[in-house]
């Protein structure tokens, strides 16, 4: 649950995929959440980000070592004082509407994205000018050194700096785009889209992958199917049954208790797709009382137990591990300093901190996503923990898209 920030419930969960062993011209897949929001700049939902990676392309991309590699960019130069970056685009890049990708498209796309993304805002603050000297190039001139220019342009976390036509990128960053047109390996079939139900992607015949082999987000993106249909199947058992029967080809998140069924199925492969694929985080609205009080937030931390969350979501300890690092648990920047969150809950200390913080029974709203299986079990755990130390809790259930919209607002509940 990428509710970035908080008090340390950084619970690393191991995610699983299941795919039928076949490569049909059409791939029918079930992903972790229903797709409702199409604008990859307007939301940081990973379901929308993944939608974006199918139809858009990026200037740079991160490889398996975490290093930025060129994607849409062919070559670039950096001035001796590290203040001027000039980039030349790969030849022949075309949007799905047939128009050529230009430096002006890049500048407009980055200008919109910078208004929504934290790293983009930092880059913008360090930038003096951003322009397009020629049709196939763009330039960033800094007013002060910024050592993460390439890393920022290639960041895979939402919102991703996807490149779209200038006419679309000129949409205000507070409004949703009305067309989903990129230059990526697949075209989005807008007529076939049913929000929260179905999304269809058609192979882009004009897409030319890079020659380098694929490596994480970088390298050649080779379309393996002529058509991809993303289908929402809310019930986990129904999705597994459909996989058994050959009605779908891929399930992104498999409920752990259903893995034995898949392990015995012919023609089905079950794989873990990463060592640190998901990190659950509990994020509090620290701008509003009573959670603007550090003592109250410390009380919440003392009341939580990572194992309770992971058992509720995943069940078997072999599918998860405890981790107290605020950054990625496999990152070179990992540190367990101050990692109290992996200790058992201390309810007596939590109650004492509440009293010390002057808690007066104010209502705490816990947002509960009902249509994302891996997340739906978490809110009840939080509610029970807070109630156990005497806090007033209001659990509000909603779909994931509504939660994301609600979460982006810091106004009182």
Describe each model-derived feature in a short phrase.
Residues 74-119, 133, 138-141, 242, ...:
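Aromatic- and charge-enriched surface segment that lines or borders ligand/interaction sites
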Residues 67, 156-229, 237-238, 347-348, ...:
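Gly/Pro-rich hinge or "lid" segments in bacterial periplasmic/extracellular proteins
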Residues 209-261, 384, 392:
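Ligand-site clamp/hinge motif
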Residues 21, 88, 122-194:
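Surface-exposed binding/hinge segments that line
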Residues 30-80, 111, 181:
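N-terminal lobe/hinge region of extracytoplasmic solute-binding protein
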Residues 287, 291-331, 377-378:
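Periplasmic-binding protein-like
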